């Protein structure tokens, strides 16, 4: 805790100063969704505004993260009580994400377990050639499981004070996650159906695409953690950002296992 806080503050909590970043991030994310919907429905004939909104969102989030890192690393605002609150808040965030994916699985099971006459009374629907569980989906599963293992290795190395293994494990994790996204892109490019092909295509692409978005976010979070470990900002007893990144990535790993079993194996 810095000298100013010790002199004037009698509680361990961080009183956040006014910041422009939350409202700017909110508006930029809203702009992404609106321009994306308008583009999908033909009201916009290019992706320029979608890309612009995404760039603004990334820039404002980066500036917001910069302020948080400064508060945690240099200003001493993240006391034990604050770190406990951050961990609890992030766990609640992961729970909210869990319910989001539950809704996606619910939509899939609702249609798959009682296919209507419009679908031909079968699942997958008539005319849909589903993607099987072998080849790319199986490779993606192996990649994510390996990345989860290397991430756990990196975390244990950090706890043990082994800086080299910490960085190596984190680099391997990011490389495996990027490879997963490349394979996912290849799968989408060669898929025999699109997001417009009825409920099967809609739920499949929404579920796997939303998971892919979480992988991208996880890569960014792990990349920031890699930079902070490399610059000696995180230690073996103070690395809340890295711990939350690990929790997030393992959650995404588990979600993929359910996606693989339900969408690629049982659902086909």
Swiss-Prot record:
Q: How does it sit in the membrane?
A: Multi-pass membrane protein
Supply the source organism for this entry.
Yarrowia lipolytica (strain CLIB 122 / E 150) (Yeast)
Q: Which reaction does it catalyse?
A: 4 Fe(II)-[cytochrome c] + O2 + 8 H(+)(in) = 4 Fe(III)-[cytochrome c] + 2 H2O + 4 H(+)(out)
Q: Which UniProt keywords apply?
A: Membrane, Mitochondrion, Mitochondrion inner membrane, Translocase, Transmembrane, Transmembrane helix
Give the protein's biological function.
Component of the cytochrome c oxidase, the last enzyme in the mitochondrial electron transport chain which drives oxidative phosphorylation. The respiratory chain contains 3 multisubunit complexes succinate dehydrogenase (complex II, CII), ubiquinol-cytochrome c oxidoreductase (cytochrome b-c1 complex, complex III, CIII) and cytochrome c oxidase (complex IV, CIV), that cooperate to transfer electrons derived from NADH and succinate to molecular oxygen, creating an electrochemical gradient over the inner membrane that drives transmembrane transport and the ATP synthase.
| Any one GO molecular function term | cytochrome-c oxidase activity
- EC number(s) recorded for this UniProt protein: 7.1.1.9
For this entry, the protein name equals Cytochrome c oxidase subunit 3
Subunit-level organization: Component of the cytochrome c oxidase (complex IV, CIV), a multisubunit enzyme composed of a catalytic core of 3 subunits and several supernumerary subunits. The complex exists as a monomer or a dimer and forms supercomplexes (SCs) in the inner mitochondrial membrane with ubiquinol-cytochrome c oxidoreductase (cytochrome b-c1 complex, complex III, CIII).
């Amino acid at each position: 805790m810095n000298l100013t806080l010790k002199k004037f503050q009698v509680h361990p909590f961080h009183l956040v100063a006014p910041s422009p970043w939350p409202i700017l991030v909110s508006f930029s994310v809203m702009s992404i969704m609106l321009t994306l919907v308008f583009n999908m429905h033909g009201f916009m004939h290019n992706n320029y505004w979608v890309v612009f909104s995404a760039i603004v969102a990334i820039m404002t989030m980066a500036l917001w993260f910069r302020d948080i890192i400064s508060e945690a690393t240099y200003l001493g605002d993240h006391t034990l009580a604050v770190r406990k609150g951050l961990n609890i808040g992030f766990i609640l965030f992961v729970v909210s994400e869990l319910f989001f994916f539950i809704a996606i699985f619910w939509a899939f099971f609702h249609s798959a377990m009682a296919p209507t006459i419009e679908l031909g009374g079968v699942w997958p629907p008539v005319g849909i050639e589903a993607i099987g569980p072998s080849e790319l989906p199986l490779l993606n599963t192996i990649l994510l499981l390996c990345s989860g293992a290397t991430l756990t290795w990196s975390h244990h190395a950090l706890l043990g004070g082994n800086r080299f293994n910490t960085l190596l494990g984190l680099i391997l994790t990011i490389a495996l996650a990027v490879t997963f996204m490349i394979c996912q892109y290849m799968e989408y490019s060669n898929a025999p159906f699109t997001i417009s092909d009825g409920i099967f295509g809609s739920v499949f692409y929404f579920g796997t695409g939303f998971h892919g978005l979480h992988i991208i976010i996880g890569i960014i979070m792990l990349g920031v953690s890699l930079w902070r470990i490399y610059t000696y900002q995180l230690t073996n007893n103070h690395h809340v950002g890295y711990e939350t990144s690990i929790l997030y990535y393992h959650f995404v790993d588990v979600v993929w296992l359910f996606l693989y079993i339900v969408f690629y194996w049982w659902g086909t």
